[in-house]
Amino acid sequence: TRFVLSDCDLISVFAATPINNTATTTDLARPVSAGSNLTTDIGRFNAGALVTPVVTAQYFIQDTDLAPGPANYRPSLFRSINGAAPEELVEGVEILQARYGIDDAGEVTTIDQYVTADAVPDWNRVVAVNLGMLIRSPEETGTDVDPATYDVLGTVVGPFNDRRQRTLLTTTITLRNRTK
């Protein structure tokens, strides 16, 4: 199991095996094996430091078949935690885009550019994440088709030429451990 040990000054990620777990304490075994556990101390942490398990969450868009036939699919935002079965979070999410704010100069006060994941030159320079979602209504409404195109963080989609209502949502998340 992977854990994060952190206080306000230091952070360390390590692998360990719980050997005694009660309601108030967990003892961690530190047997050394290739690529998993530490062979040296990980540093001096302040009082109040926290040890928490690493949680891996994957977010993705997947079609949900409501009934047979292509007209009956519904795109939705799903999440899978630590490889578990995915759960549907939000129905109608057609597009999910992420761009990463890069601090080229290293002063950690400004974002010099936003890039896609495959263009991140150094993940240590990422100081923010820009997210965009295009969400559609579950049902078609009215008589007019949607002739619009939508710019989801630089990816232009549409026109869809259906009668669904759509909204574009964007937000920027600052990574607090990366900024001053």
What are these regions (language model features)?
Residues 34-36, 84:
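Short coil/turn segments at the loop-to-beta-strand junctions that recur within blades
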